[in-house]
From Swiss-Prot:
Keywords: Aminoacyl-tRNA synthetase, ATP-binding, Cytoplasm, Ligase, Magnesium, Metal-binding, Nucleotide-binding, Protein biosynthesis. Belongs to the class-II aminoacyl-tRNA synthetase family. Phe-tRNA synthetase alpha subunit type 1 subfamily. Pfam families: Phe_tRNA-synt_N, tRNA-synt_2d. This is Phenylalanine--tRNA ligase alpha subunit. Tetramer of two alpha and two beta subunits. One of its GO terms (molecular function) is ATP binding. Its cofactor is Mg(2+). Its EC number is 6.1.1.20. One of its GO terms (biological process) is phenylalanyl-tRNA aminoacylation. It catalyses: tRNA(Phe) + L-phenylalanine + ATP = L-phenylalanyl-tRNA(Phe) + AMP + diphosphate + H(+). The gene is pheS.
Length: 345
């Protein structure tokens, strides 16, 4: 049977071709020639109708066996050529050389300071609250005892979206929102971004603040002093000295500015024989503002100022980071300079 002989000759013929194939391209050409849709095996199978009905099953069975043999030999040669190609590629460099570990980033100093502050206040039983950065004028000013045309609004260069919508200038609106949603006692801190129309070595249009609020029956200025002293010594060290100075904020009465002994000179006013550039030789640096919540704020949120008292405070995260890490220029926090940021890894 001529067709059977042609079929049986395909295997040794392919083997000779495989021995001569030196690349995957030549191997693919062989596959198409023998196993392709118009290849040698397909041509032989196309002549099956020429055979008698008795011979067709035998030739079909033989064709299946030949196809399996051709495929097996082809795959074997393909594996060998792929291994040779990979070995040739590897020969161009030394795979035993030690690898280079991927570069790892680090947390931003703002993030480090915010996490540390939040951790301290969590330990004191405070909740962490967040809210919208695009805020209503009512929550940002009016409910905080700063009605329209109040001169205290001039203390903050506000970015307005519309006449009644603005970019929040502090996170105090979250204190109002929380008091409207909860009944006393309330103990929260509100970290987040705030916005003001200002930009220089000590100011940026966007920065981070953390503001706190405690409301309950019998809360006093002594509680405020004790809380903030404990917090500041947790962040800046147990030897840190803390002092309170009278001040003014429209939503607290009485109000105070809080200073700490200078982190750079240790409160001495000088470093060696040089005057301290941070505290300007005073030995003190301003760190935050605070006070007892004004009764007008309680009235605005539906609290009875005759029954409840509370204190509030606020501080800039970048301010804390600058003092804690000795950073001289606020703008460095926002320039994404890896040389600066990698120091905090």
């Amino acid at each position: 049977m001529d067709l059977l002989k042609e079929l049986e000759s395909l295997v040794p013929e392919l083997e000779r071709g495989l021995d001569q194939a030196s690349s995957l391209t030549e191997l693919e050409e062989l596959r198409v020639a023998f196993l392709g849709r118009k290849g040698r095996l397909a041509q032989i199978m196309g002549r099956l109708p020429e055979l008698s009905p008795e011979d067709r099953p035998r030739l079909g069975q033989a064709a299946n066996g030949v196809k399996m043999a051709l495929t097996e030999r082809f795959e074997g040669r393909k594996t060998a050529l792929e291994a040779a190609s990979e070995a040739a590629a590897l020969s161009r460099f030394d795979p035993t050389l030690p690898g280079r570990a991927p570069w790892r980033g680090s947390l931003h100093p703002d993030t480090l300071v915010m996490e540390e502050i939040c951790s301290v206040f969590r330990g004191l039983g405070y909740d962490i609250v967040t809210g919208p950065e695009v805020e209503m004028d009512h929550y940002n000013f009016e409910a905080l005892n700063m009605p329209a045309e109040h001169p205290a609004r001039d203390m903050q260069d506000t970015l307005y979206v519309t006449e009644s919508i603005l970019m929040r200038t502090h996170t105090s609106p979250l204190q109002v929102r929380t008091m409207l949603a909860r009944k006393p006692p309330v103990a929260i801190i509100a970290p987040g971004k705030v916005y003001r129309r200002d930009s220089d070595i000590t100011h940026t249009p966007m920065f981070h603040q953390i503001e706190g609020l405690m409301v309950d029956k019998g809360v006093s200025m002594a509680d405020l002093r004790g809380t903030l002293t404990s917090f500041l010594r947790n962040v800046f060290g147990g030897d840190t000295r803390v002092r309170f100075r009278p001040s003014f904020f429209p939503f607290t009465e009485p109000s105070a500015e809080v200073d700490i002994s200078c982190c750079i000179c240790g409160g001495k006013g000088h470093v060696g024989n040089e005057p301290c550039r941070v505290c300007k030789t005073t030995g003190w640096v301003e760190i935050l503002g605070c006070g007892m919540v004004d009764p007008a704020v309680f009235t605005a949120v539906g609290y009875d100022p005759e029954e409840y008292t509370g204190f509030a405070f606020g501080l800039g995260v970048e301010r804390v980071a600058m003092l804690k890490y000795g950073i001289g220029d606020l703008r460095m926090f926002f320039e994404n300079d890896v040389r600066f940021l990698s120091q905090f890894s």
